[in-house]
Structure formats: C-alpha cells, structure tokens
Amino acid sequence: MNPSDLPGQIPLSRSDMNVQDQLDPVQRFDTHFMLPQEENFLNRPSITSESAHPRGSDLEQETELKRLALEHEHYSLESLAEKLRMDHVSANSEKFRQVFGICWLKRACEEQQDAAVQRNQIYAHYVEICNSLHIKPLNSASFGKLVRLLFPSIKTRRLGMRGHSKYHYCGIKLRGQDSFRRLRTFSDSSLSPVSCSSFPKPIPNHFENDVSSIQNTNQRVESSPASVNAAAIVRKSAVTPSSDPYNSPPPSIPLLGSQTNLQLAPSFAAPQAHPLPSHLSQSNVPPQLSHSSVPSPAPPRSVSQPTYFSQPMPQFSSSFVPGTSSIVPTLHPASAQEDFNLQHSLFFKLKLKFLPPHKLPWIPSLDVSSFSLPPIDYYLNGPYDNVEAKSALMNIYSSHCITLIESVRYMHLKQFLSEISNFPNSLSPSLLALLSSPYFTKWIERSDTVMYREILKLLFPMTLQVVPPPVLVLLRHLAENLVNHISSIYASHSSCLLQVKSETAAIFSNLLSRLLRVNDTAHAAARFLANPADRHLICNDWERFVSTRFIVHRELMCNDKEAVAALDEWYSILSTCSNPSELLDPLKDKHEASDTSMNRVELRQIDGVLDRMADFFLELPSRFPSCSPRMFLLCLGALQTSVLREITVSGGEAFGALWVIRCWVDEYMTWVAEIGGYLDDSYDELEQHHANFHNKAGISQSNIPPHLQEHRQSQQHFQQDIEALQSQQQQQATKNSLMEAAYQNAQKQKEDDYISIVFDTNGACS
C-alpha cells in the first residue's frame, strides 16, 4: 500500500518516496518521523505545509478569520485584550484569540523580500505582549498557522552556523527591527508546541549546555532507599485508573534529546558530600559557562548556625527540622521510609500565630498584577550566574501561578486541575530539567507557598459568609483530591520536585479543609444563636450550674481575673436578647467597634450574634500576650469542656446547643491561629536576610534590592538580631516549662485535697 494513499497524508514526489523506501517500516508511515533523518530533507517543499492545499472547511475558517480581523483592525490591542478577558470562557474565545494574534501580526510585522527573522523571535514578542495584557497566548503551532495565513508567500529556512542554526521566516521582518535586536532570542528548545499558558522569556543559546551540566551532576548523586521507596509508592498509586479526567499522568518527557526518559530520579542528598565529576571541572567547562555558571557545591554546614537556618540545602530523604516556621511531619523518620502518601500518612504541624484583626484579609485584593514570586537568588544553594535561565524560569512559573490564582478566583476548578496537569508538558526539556534540579527546589517551595497564600486570601472571607452549596462541593472536592492529583502528575519526574509539590499542596489542602469546617460549623451554630428560645435555655443553665470563678481556678493557673472576665463577657453576649434590627446590624450602637468588625458587617454575615461572638474571640488572644497560641487553644478548650461538663452532670437541657457552639469556637480559633501562622511573612523576611548574609559571594550587587543592601553592609547587626531571637525563644520555652510544672503541682495538690476530703467524709460516716 502506498503511504500517500492513506487518508490525511500529503502526496509525496517520486524522489521523496525513494527516500521513504529506505527508512524503517515503522518510520515509513509517519512523515514527521523523517524530519530529523537528514538536514537537506527538511527544506524539501513536498512535505511542508506550503504545498498542501487547504480543504473546504479550512478555507471557510480562514475566510472567517480574515473577515473578523478586518472588522477589529481599527481597535487597539488593549481594547481587544479587554474583550478577550471578559469572554474568556465563551465558545468563541479561541477564535477571538486568533483574531487578536492576526491584529498583532499586522501591527508588528511587514513583508520585505530580502529580510529574514527568527521564527521563535516573532513568537517571543507575541507571548510578551500577551503577558503584559494578561491574556492567554496561542501555542506556537497555532500561531505559526496565523503567520502562514497572513503572509502566504514566506518560506521557512534554517540559517546559521552548524550547531547553532535556527529556523527563520524569509520574506518578512519585525517593524523597527533595530529596536528588537537588543532583546535576547529563543533557542528552538525554549518553546514547546503545547505551550499555551506559559509566558517564557528569551533564553540564550548556551542555556541547554548549562542545564545538561546540572543534569549530569544530578545523575551522579546516589539515591537513598527512602526516596526510591517513596517515589516508587507514589508511582504505584499514580497508575491506578481514575474516573477524573484530570488525574491522568502526563507522558514522560525526554531530557535534552536523551534516549531514556526520566521515570525515577534519585533523591538528591546534600551536594557537599558529592563533589563535581571530573568532566565538570573548571578546565573542562566551556567558556560561556565559566565563572560560576554551573552551580557550585554548598559550603559545609556550620555547627554554630542557628537551628532556623541549619539546612542550606533541603534534605528530601528525611523529615524537616523541628522548630522552623515551615510545616513539619510528626511521624518518626523510619515510618517515612515506608510510606510517602501525604494525604493519609503524614500529619502536619503548623506554625500557629494570632495576627491582629486588621491584618487578616477580610477584604482581599483582587489585583493580580501585583502578584510576584520571591527572587531566586535568595533560595539557591550556591552561586548561579545564568541570569537568562533564572529569568526565563521565574517568568514561566509566575504565569503558571497567576493562572491558578485566577482559576480559583472565578471558581473554575476544572481549569485549575487542568492547568496543573498541562504545566509540565508545556515546558521544554531544558526548562523541565532546570525545574527538577535540586538547586531550585527551595525556590519552588517558596513560590508555591506564596501562590497558595494568595488563594487562601481570596477564600478567607468565606469564614463567616453564606456560600452557595455548589461552591462548597467544588472546594471540598479540590481539598480532597489535590494531593493525589499532583502526585500522579509529577510521579515521573524527580523525587525532590515531587516531594516539594506534594508537601505544599498538602498544607494548602489541610488549610482549605479547615476553612470549610469553620463554615459548616458556623451555619450549625447560627441556627441555635439565631433562636431566642435556644439562647435563653443556654443562659438559664449557665446561671444555674456554672461558676466561672471556680472553673477558672480549677482549670487554669494564671491570669485568673482576666479569664473570669472573659467567660463573663462570653455569657453576656449569649444572654443579650437582640431584636431583629440588631441581628442585622449588631454594631449599630457600639461606637467602640473596630474597623475590622465594620468591614465584616458590610459583608452580610450569617448572624448578628455569631458575628459579635466572632469579634470577641478574635480579640481574646490579645488579652493574654504571655501565652503562646498553642497553650491558648488548650486552655480555651479546657474551659469550654469544663462548662459543658458542669451542665451535663447537673442535668441541664442546653448541652446539645452549647456543644454545637463549642465545636464552632474550636474550629474558628484553630483556623485563625493556623492561617495567621501561614500568612505571617516576618519569618520569610528574616530567612531572606540570612540567605543574603551567607550567599553574598554568589549574588551580585546589582541583583540585590535597595532595601536589602543595608543588611549586607551591617552583618554584625544581623548576627545580633539572630542571637536576640534565640534568647527570646529560649526564655519563652523556659517560661512555658515553668507554667506546665506549676500546673502539674496544682493538679496534684487538688487531687490530694480531694482524696483527703473523701477519707475524712468516710471516716466521719463510719
């Protein structure tokens, strides 16, 4: 059977068929497979699209595109982008993106017979315009069709020196060619045909050599049993069939033209234990990669360094260091070698902190243009001077994060999961190898944390709002399946990238689940608080059976007066019989209400009494400044349990209603403490200062922001701040231990007194 007779195949000339007969039978029926066989064969017009005649339906589509482009030709690019952003979910959004591309080509390119311009250079400028206007660009294949449609007489030629040649469009040029020559150019591997949501920056020609050096270094690092077992478990779970179309793993991507795919990368240990191979010595490094363009090993770990900064390189084969502001697993390290399923086997311990009420995002910012990722230089293990590679990776990852944030903002959660699935495939092998390198894992972790922070800021007003049930169902589905989805997507990539992406997603999923629990319990508590009869029943049982002074004296060992006053104020909020108008506006007659409360009242909360109670508990931690957040939550839970126990033992009827309210208080206060610790950026600034202090040899002065250059000049003051922070934490730990010892002594004394009273009573009775 002649291959040209197959449906959809382009007719080949006799000379082309002779070349085809010499190929392998498997390759014979795939014309695209013949492209890399012979360089002269690439320029034959018989297998290119120039000789192909479009079908009738294609002619109609091209005519329609030309007509639409002619109608919108007088519009500015800003107005076209605004219309595209408004109709980005409609059925005609893809066609209108093509119209935008044609309009941009008419403004940016012009025909000239003796001109030639790189094919990727035109696409790079188009992507840059789309990035500045915050719209999703077309992929390179669709954009190339538009170039052919607008300029049908151009030809594609491969020009340049051997080994450095690039594809060029011959017959057109960019308008103002001199102004574009100052910009960097793309290499052919910098863009992928499926890159439809990334905004890449131009990458120099030596970028692939730089990444291959990193890859060769990574391949020589020995893999630990824990990481291999963990990655194998995740890969085993990844191949399980799933009904979710977004949970399918992506195809494996060959790295830098290698014949083997990256199926299971080793776990990267500390680089100082593995020196660079002989083939990567300074004498063998190409001239364009000299002077620290290949990342150097990290300096040896100093014993005198603080615990907060004791790991210059993340150890992915073991658990995190306790005491840091990040989330640490509570499992034993030996158990982490047996299972890596974060969704079911790892329990995370969040840093808790009660932020002031005015710092909580009750009214989040909707300006996505202000979003920015942390600089890469602060989170690199060693000096890395390839500015172009870092800029390209940062720009692509920033666009990916912005797309995810906007998907959650408009509740397009299917698009959220689809973007996560398509992101690895949209990267070129060079950028994917750089993303999987252990030198950038710390930056990826911080970037994902910044992105998830912005998403939680958008969702934070749901704490006390009435949310439609379909939205709750979608968010609950996202919280339950995000970790498994990311694990299946990155199962075929390096183990360090898989672990970082999975851990940050698990933290976000836990916080999102906590937010949904707060919203559910708030609705349940509002049913009782909005009913005057239930509230009257609670207050009646409280007056009859609860003695706040006795409960505080029995459960706590400090701040008795303040704790008694807090319980009495809580009772006064419950006992207030509000009229319907006051329920809608509980702060109508309270001039001392804070601005935060006024902002939340404007958001039309669930219930006035619930809103007032939320304000009370939100301000309550500030009354106990010497109490840590975790100790505060334990004491609050002990007081509520004691109140419930007194009412239950005494036969009160308000136990059920008070129990539901208590559940909401526990969830709400835990959520406020967890989100406060997660959104707190004071530790991030301190960590960046420390990274600047220790990596000053690898960061040029021009790359350091002005507000951080002062810290580089005052190293002694920074060390004093670190020592002061250590001493303050040590004092706090000593104070907590003394408080626990006093509490235990008080409990023991109470038990002894109780036993003596029982014995005296029995003796008197006998």
Swiss-Prot record:
MF term (GO), any: DNA-binding transcription factor activity, RNA polymerase II-specific
DNA-binding region per UniProt: 101-176
Start-end of Low complexity biased regions: 290-308, 715-731
Keyword Nucleus: yes
Residues recorded with modification Phosphoserine: S223, S224, S227
Segments of this protein annotated with the region Disordered: 271-308, 708-731
GO process terms (BP): positive regulation of transcription by RNA polymerase II; regulation of transcription by RNA polymerase II
InterPro entries named in the record: DNA-bd_RFX (IPR003150), RFX-like (IPR039779), WH-like_DNA-bd_sf (IPR036388), WH_DNA-bd_sf (IPR036390)
The keyword GTP-binding is assigned to this record: no
UniProt entry keywords in alphabetical sequence: DNA-binding, Nucleus, Phosphoprotein
Compositional bias ranges of the Polar residues kind: 279-289
GO annotation, cellular component aspect: chromatin; cytoplasm; nucleus
Protein's cellular compartments: Nucleus
PANTHER family xrefs: RFX TRANSCRIPTION FACTOR FAMILY, TRANSCRIPTION FACTOR RFX4
Stated family: Belongs to the RFX family.
Known function: Positively regulates cyclic AMP-dependent protein kinase-mediated exit from the mitotic cell cycle.
Protein name according to UniProt: Protein sak1
Organism of provenance: Schizosaccharomyces pombe (strain 972 / ATCC 24843)
